[in-house]
Amino acid sequence: NYIGKEGGDGYDYEDKITARVRLGLDAKVNKTTSVKARITTGSIELGDSSKEAQANWDLAYVEHKFGKNVVVDAGRYTQKFGGGLIYSSNFDGVGATAKLGDKVTLNGAYGYMTAGRFAKTSKADNGDVGLINANVAVNDRFGFGGMFAHVGTTNVRMGNGKKNNEFDNVYGFNAKYNIGKFGIDGEWVKASGLSDSDIWNVGVKWGDYKINKKNSWAIRLDYFDQAKNAPVFKTQKYESNDLLKKTRYEGYKAWQLGASYAPEKNIGINAY
């Protein structure tokens, strides 16, 4: 993964190359139940030996299927909030996904976020989350969805520089359209408990990148508009100055250009 940044706020950022290895495990208990886990090295910056890379279990959960249309996950699994703009990572709790016919999918979850801004957060400082996602596939090209979540009180530093944020209810909408290798998507999210708390994103892509498909590739251009109190629970790539505690916490407006390529099956190269 190659990262290059130019500071627009008076700070300069060095280019760097990072690498990460993940190993997924899937043990089937019976026809309807599986135990799944994943080992990861975390992000390693090439040329920097000051930080020791240690493998750890970042996912471990049980997956059970009730018939063909209902799946339940319990443990530490990957949970998406809406289209993934504000969070799509590790989640400790229980989630259920149900398909209603060929077009409608419902997802509900309860638990705790444990990655992004919530990485290395104690349970006392974390807040529980109740979440509902709904998605509708209108046809093979167009789909849209909505999300609603209630976020408990947390003691975790967010993009506005504050630790105690009463986001309360978080809701949003997303949509996507694809035709051939071209795709466009967008999402808008807001928190009811704080003013100046919306975030939206529009992205376009060209290609059909899949990490399990050799020689597949894609390029993508995104625009982000993040208000200072937006409920962004993952760490966005454009927030480097925030993570270095050198920002004025006024929100972000950013363009992001990225590319992905799979030289071999299950090997991916990403640059942005």
Language-model region placement:
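Outer membrane beta-barrel transmembrane domains
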Residues: 132-134, 144-149, 153, 157-159, ...
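Beta-barrel outer-membrane channel/assembly domains of diderm bacteria
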Residues: 1-73, 94-108, 124, 132-140, ...
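Sequence/structural signature of outer-membrane beta-barrel proteins
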Residues: 2-7, 40-49, 76-84, 111-121, ...
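Solenoidal tandem-repeat scaffolds enriched in leucines and small polar residues
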Residues: 112-145, 150-152
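Active-site cleft segment of glycoside hydrolase catalytic domains centered on the general acid/base Glu
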Residues: 86-88
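Small/polar residue-rich beta-strand/coil "junction" motifs that cap repeat-based extracellular fibers
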Residues: 205-213
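Flexible, surface-exposed loop regions and adjacent strand-edge segments
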Residues: 53-54, 91-93, 236-240
